[in-house]
Amino acid sequence: MSVQSTIRRKTAPDIRARKGGDPIVMLTSYHAHTASLVDRYCDAILVGDSLGNVMHGFETTVPVTLEMMILQGHAVMRGSQHALVVVDMPFGSYEASKEQAFHSAARILKETHCGAVKLEGGVRMAETIRFLTERGIPVMGHIGLTPQSINTLGSFRAQGREEGSWEPIEADAKAVAEAGAFSVVVEAVAEPLGRKITETIAIPTIGIGASAACDGQVLVLEDMLGLSPKPPKFVKRYGDLGPGIEAAIKGYAEEVRSRAFPGPEHVYGMKSKA
C-alpha cells in the first residue's frame, strides 16, 4: 500500500488548458529554498540551463551538463509542492537524434520526478518533440532567441526586428505546436511578432522579452531580484537584493574580525548539575 500526497501539483495539461485564460506565471529556480518561495506564487518553475550562468559563472549555457540539470531539478522538486516543474534539456543531450533525446528526457523525468522538459528549436526539432510527446514525455518548446545556439547566432540579440524576418520564427512556433508541445517559450522577439504568434498558435506562449499579450511570462529569478549585474533589457527588477546581501556579509565580516560575533546569546554554556 502506497501513501499518496493530498497536495495536487499542476501538470502540463493544466498549463495547456490556460491558453487565452489567466496569464501563466513562471520563474526559474535551481535550489530547494528558492523553489519553496517561488512555489507559493507561480504556476510553473523552470529549472533553466541558465544555472550555468547564475550558479557556475559560465558565459553561455553551452557547458551545462545533463547531470547538472538532474541534480538541480531534483532539488527544486523537493522544495516545491504545487507548481509544474519543467527542466531544461542542456546542449548536447538531445540534438543528435530523437532517440538520444528520449533517453535524456526519460532520465530527467525518472531521476527528478519533474513534470516536463524544455528544449530549444522549432522546425528542426519538431520531429523530436513529436517523438517525445508520443512516448509520454511532456515538452515545452523554446523559439526566438535560443541561447544554446549562441555559437551560430554570434550574439544574444533580439530576433524578428527586421522586415522579412518573421516567417522562420512563425514557422518555428507553428511546428512546435503541431508537434505536440504543451506550451512554448518565446524569447527576445519583436513585440508585434510575439503578439501575432500568441494569436496564431493553439498552445500557450510564455514570453521572455516578447509581448504582454503572451499567455504567460517567465524571468530568471536572480535577474528580477536584482542579483545579476547586467540583466537583459527585458528584465524588470522587482527587488534589489544585491546591496542588502553585500551589507549583511560586510557586517558579518566586521563582527568576526572584532570578535563581536558570536555573542553570549550565540554560544552554549555548561549544563547545571542536577
From Swiss-Prot:
GO MF term (any one): magnesium ion binding
Cofactor note: Binds 1 Mg(2+) ion per subunit.
Catalytic residues (positions): 187
Pfam family, one: Pantoate_transf
Enzyme Commission (EC) number: 2.1.2.11
Pathway(s) the chain acts in: Cofactor biosynthesis; (R)-pantothenate biosynthesis; (R)-pantoate from 3-methyl-2-oxobutanoate: step 1/2
Annotated catalysed reactions: 3-methyl-2-oxobutanoate + (6R)-5,10-methylene-5,6,7,8-tetrahydrofolate + H2O = 2-dehydropantoate + (6S)-5,6,7,8-tetrahydrofolate
Requisite cofactors: Mg(2+)
GO CC annotations, alphabetized: cytoplasm
Keywords: Cytoplasm, Magnesium, Metal-binding, Pantothenate biosynthesis, Transferase
Positions of Mg(2+) binding: 49, 88, 120
Database matches in InterPro entries: Pantoate_hydroxy_MeTrfase, Pyrv/PenolPyrv_kinase-like_dom, Pyrv_kinase-like_dom_sf
Gene Ontology terms: biological process: pantothenate biosynthetic process
The keyword Metal-binding appears for this protein: yes
Location of this chain's protein in the cell: Cytoplasm
Binding site for 3-methyl-2-oxobutanoate: 49-50, 88, 118
PANTHER family on file: 3-METHYL-2-OXOBUTANOATE HYDROXYMETHYLTRANSFERASE
Family: Belongs to the PanB family.
Subunit details: Homodecamer; pentamer of dimers.
Function field: Catalyzes the reversible reaction in which hydroxymethyl group from 5,10-methylenetetrahydrofolate is transferred onto alpha-ketoisovalerate to form ketopantoate.
Protein name according to UniProt: 3-methyl-2-oxobutanoate hydroxymethyltransferase
